[in-house]
From Swiss-Prot, chains A, B:
Residue numbers binding FAD: 147-150, 155-156, 189, 318, 338-341, 409, 434
Pfam families for this protein: ACOX, ACOX_C_alpha1, Acyl-CoA_ox_N
UniProt: substrate binding residues: 283-286, 293, 431-432
Entry EC no(s): 1.3.3.-
Compartments (UniProt record): Peroxisome
Site feature Important for asc-omega-C5-CoA binding and thus substrate specificity, where: 299
Keyword field contains Nucleotide-binding: yes
Organism: Caenorhabditis elegans
Record's protein name: Acyl-coenzyme A oxidase acox-1.2
Keywords per UniProt: ATP-binding, FAD, Fatty acid metabolism, Flavoprotein, Lipid metabolism, Nucleotide-binding, Oxidoreductase, Peroxisome
Reported impact of residue 432 to A: Increases ATP and FAD binding
């Protein structure tokens, strides 16, 4: 059997879909998740979790108040702590991520930053003695930590952080202080209520000299009572668009004193007498950010996959209207408009995941290079991941919302759960670097590259930018390589054009900053085209390496859909290099591949193997029994606990009675 | 003073902005709201409401649980009932809408459908005797009603509703029945918990003949106890993406009997012996839908205005990074990327509101014509509003999300409130006709129009479609009329092209339905272009009628921004009619007008005169005191009621203690 999701008793609508699969969904999962081994481990973890009743949701998440969500996240994390060694290899980040997604979902928990930033920062920034003191305790979860950097008044611009750590030579202490309301640390996950320690980023000041932002270990709460220490003002920043099981917090410090040895001193040092010893390499703190961004394409791809799983399955269950058959209504998945809403996003989900694998691989490669003293790849990867993060998070958000709307009215119900996935995914446009800022960081790299070429130094270009030095050729669209050439033409033209605009403005007398700002939108356009080119190439590279023929065939269809959709989407740029006849051809190809994908659509989403537990969606259930479960779900929702609501007794009944008089 | 929003003690950042206004914001408000009279009434209502303490929010809405939101909506509506006559002219729909938006906001209340559909349907569908029986009681709010049409298994396809009303001649009763789970009425606002009556849409069946959907008055709950009657299963459908103060409901009817006279019989009749008397005009029930859609452009424009008010004000308060001045950080509103995120949407907000006025006017004109027996304009307006509803709701959603992201991290906090506005507005892509279905309804009209032209009957075209018969001319972009011509060229070309594709597929042997489906995406493209053309023209018509020079000047700038942005957005189509040099000109114009709008940006959003109460946003406060109020808001959020959460006591403390052993 090719689709492995078939079970007895399934809705026949989905059975029919799954029987059309032309490939083995387990083999596709191995391609999606990078190895047969990890795809199998995912299934095993899902299976093991399903057998531990205390790890199940106490209620559907949408029925919980915010306080209940925080409690539920905390309950789950404390229970998971018991089972961790039994369920996963704790050193395997991917297994851990999958486990947490299954059990806790997307809405957050008190250990989010503890594992993702607190411990890694201790590992990379704390000296050996400091690690001895704190790292094991943190690993054993004796203490809970977070990472406190952004402030109420400042996000991405680290140079203007207001929190200070002034060194007091007499007592050999740092005095940490947030002098204004805008200096309050704001947003760090789990800072508000859960953590008792924080790594606080503050401007290091010695004898009135500012040495810039550094990390300080700060105890926030008493380890026994959990009550905030004197000088510490800490609390939750209030409800958010999503992540409401997490207690993102604020933190004010009122001349709080910590010992000199609480400055993380792996790379820099402050001696007892106040002598500052510089770190050997200025960019050493940089790579954590690049790491997280390099994982984002994969993560966002999975968010998109989540939403599409729900929408594609539901679209095969929902019938509405008629085509040829006047007796039986048609599955809404048979409408071209529905396919056009879902399938290009499906191609993107695959593309993003494959691109994510590549950047994660590039990142590990970079770490090895840096260890060997070679930091030349840093700028390339930083630029690449900045662009990817922006483009992928933006297109993921669009795709998720279209998936939700493709579910009609029921998509709007929390029973679809798609709006939660949207809320989480769209955060990616803002966190880890605001999208416009990120696109402009990539643009800086592109402009530098063009300037290198103009200076005759094209050989110094990073591998991702080398096409910028090529000549734009006429190309045909008879092969995938033709599409790549077309995207190269477009990305190259726009990078040069935006650079020229910027340079011309400077020549005309504008300052560098003003010229940059006046070219900014054109520069972001260049960054987007460059990034989309990279995604297409990564998709192609991955497909070319697949050995299983049926899997390769359907992914080749998806790739064709992708290149045609993408090209049409930016055809304004393409028309400098192709004719309207070619454009019509691209359109026809697009519609052709929508039809080609149709029979495999449900199997392509099944291949993501996102369990019902993780989907948390009535519409997206594997078994397709949507309607009876929507009714069940609704009946159990909290508002239905009473037939007559207290508010009806209190307000509506008296109002109606009074009107009768 | 030109900007009327200036008060003592405001944040100087906003004061500086407002002092740059080149026009009078009260005069602009009169243009936005159609008359000086209504703009003034809005301010008076806002002012009056602010003086009635019991109409204030008991807490910021984001701090309320769903149950508390329902209670709060109910409390407010019952208090408002007392004050209605004092605060507004009850016959004035606009005043009523404004009042409800101020006091209750966007998240719903138990009378949403009572006023908007229950009473109007009684007015248009109930006979005089029936009106006497129910209408006055409904108006006095002795009873609360809703309108129950969509079912769990069927939304827009009315022909396949499953609920039946079988006439029993012996007892002269209708037997109402929902035979399956999918037949449950699903979604009607206030049906779940608040209403005691419903107008139920059911298939009328007499002697096994199905006469199609009809309206039946059905009592759901006992008027005294509010307990559901026998045969009635009713409840809340659970939490939604938004509208969570509303109890959208489900309804099952188990062979419930109602008297023959509960069929609404203004236009059709069922005699005691089961004789069915047809309504005189088949489309008579149609116009309610057209009315609501004709108001949607205005409504969505105001949602967009709401989000932009928040984002523009906050962008003038938030400082981040540097341009020329290395000492003082720059307002983020000075970044071109930020302007590009906000100002084209600002132009659209104005455009949508102006377009809304036109369609509302066309609707009243239509009603007069229909009264005179002339229904010829019906199809035109139906097509127009179908397209408008789709394009405007889609672009509004995009614009609101961009506004939220323009606020960076704080945009993601519920303190911005933008995500609530998004949740409400984006519902407009689905309710009142799913967007794709709507675009295809307009497409049907466009195809018919092209077929008329091909048949030599161009004179029969509706006024909105007459341009389809013109020849495509070369045009220049030196005047606004040039842009209109360009949009006509594009919309015409695409309408013809999509029609040809459809006809060709039929010629090649496909059935009408299949040919239609295979052309569907191209047809929706035609509908979008046609609609965007109409919006541009409506914007131009409105600006041309303005007398106040300063107001006209700034709106002319906004109009120029609009046409350039819109043209660039669909340049793929435009390039068939213009050169790349012209395209570069359009880009330059776009950036030029972003700069031109900049000094008036805050004053342009101030002109919407959306009160702080209605904004419900800490970021968007009129006085600009954002940061201290964010802190205040956060401190008062429910999670901060205790320093140490119960979940910390119960789960985290034991976990940490155990780890120490």
């Amino acid at each position: 059997m090719a689709n492995r999701s078939i079970r007895d008793g399934d809705n026949p609508e989905l059975l029919e879909e799954r029987r059309m699969a032309t490939f083995d969904t387990d083999k596709m999962a191995a391609v999606i998740y990078g190895s047969e081994e990890f795809a199998r481990r995912r299934r095993e973890i899902t299976d093991a979790v399903s057998k531990i009743p205390e790890l199940a949701d106490i209620k559907p998440y949408p029925f919980l108040t915010r306080e209940e969500k925080v409690t539920e996240g905390t309950r789950k994390i404390s229970i998971l702590t018991k089972y961790l060694n039994q369920l996963i290899d704790r050193d395997n980040e991917e297994e851990s991520l999958h486990l947490h997604r299954e059990v806790i979902g997307y809405e957050g928990h008190p250990f989010a930053l503890h594992d993702a930033l607190f411990i890694p920062t201790l590992q990379s920034q704390a000296s050996d003695e400091q690690q001895e003191k704190w790292l094991e305790r943190a690993r054993r979860r004796e203490i809970i930590g977070c990472y406190a950097q952004t402030e109420l008044g400042h996000g991405s611009n680290l140079r203007n952080l207001e929190t200070t750590a002034v060194y007091d030579i007499a007592s050999q202490e740092f005095v940490l202080h947030t002098p204004t309301t805008t200096a309050l640390k704001w947003w760090p996950g789990a800072l508000g209520k859960s953590c008792n320690y924080a790594l606080v980023v503050a401007e290091l000041i010695i004898k009135r000299n500012n040495y810039g932002p550094h990390f300080f270990m700060v105890q926030l709460r008493d380890e026994k009572t959990h009550i905030p220490l004197k000088g510490v003002t800490v609390g939750d920043i209030g409800p958010k668009m999503n992540f409401n099981a997490a207690d993102n917090g604020y933190l004010g410090l009122n001349n709080l004193r910590v010992p000199r040895t609480n400055l993380l001193m792996r790379h820099c040092k402050v001696e007892a007498d106040g002598t500052y010893v510089k770190p050997p390499h200025a960019k050493i703190g940089y790579s954590g950010m690049v790491k997280i961004r390099s994982q984002m394409a994969m993560e966002q791809g999975l968010f998109l996959a989540h939403a599409l799983t729900i929408a594609a399955r539901y679209s095969a269950v929902r019938r509405q209207g008629h085509l040829d058959d006047k007796q039986v209504e048609v599955k809404v998945l048979d409408y071209q408009t529905q396919q056009h809403r879902l399938f290009p996003s499906l191609a993107r989900a695959y593309a993003f995941i494959f691109t994510g694998f590549e950047t994660i691989h590039l990142y590990s490669q970079l770490l090895k290079d840096v260890d060997m003293g070679n930091t030349s790849g840093m700028a390339d990867l930083h630029a690449l991941t900045s662009g990817l993060k922006s483009v992928v998070a933006h297109e993921t958000g669009e795709g998720i919302e279209q998936a939700r709307m493709a579910c009609g009215g029921h998509g709007y119900s929390m029973a679809s759960y798609i709006s939660v996935v949207y809320g989480i995914a769209i955060g990616g446009c803002t966190y880890e670097g605001e999208n416009m800022v990120m696109l402009l960081q990539l643009a800086r790299y592109l402009v530098k590259s063009v300037e290198l070429i103009k200076a005759g130094k094209a050989k110094k270009l990073g591998p991702v930018a080398s096409y910028l030095a090529d000549k734009s050729d006429e190309t045909d669209l008879t092969s995938l390589n033709g599409y790549v050439k077309m995207f190269e033409n477009m990305a190259r033209r726009q990078a040069w054009k935006a650079t020229e605009k910027f340079l011309k403005l400077m020549e005309s007398g504008e300052s560098r900053e003003v010229a940059w700002n006046k070219s900014a939108v054109e520069l972001t356009r260049a960054s987007r085209l460059h990034t989309r080119l990279f995604i297409i190439e990564a998709f192609m590279r991955r497909v070319s390496r697949i050995e299983d023929i049926p899997v390769k065939e359907v992914l080749t269809d998806l790739l064709h859909l992708h290149v045609n959709y993408e090209l049409l989407d930016v055809a304004t740029y393409a028309l400098e290099f192709m004719s309207f006849t070619q454009l019509d051809y691209v359109r026809d190809q697009l519609y052709l591949y929508l039809e080609k994908i149709r029979p495999n659509a449900v199997s392509l989403v099944d291949s993501f193997q996102i369990s019902d537990m993780q989907l948390r969606s009535v519409l997206g259930r594997r078994d397709g029994h949507v309607y009876e479960n929507l009714f069940k779900w609704a009946k159990s929702s909290p508002l239905n606990n009473a037939d007559v609501l207290p508010s009806v007794e209190k307000y509506l009944k008296p109002m109606m009675e009074k009107a009768k008089l």
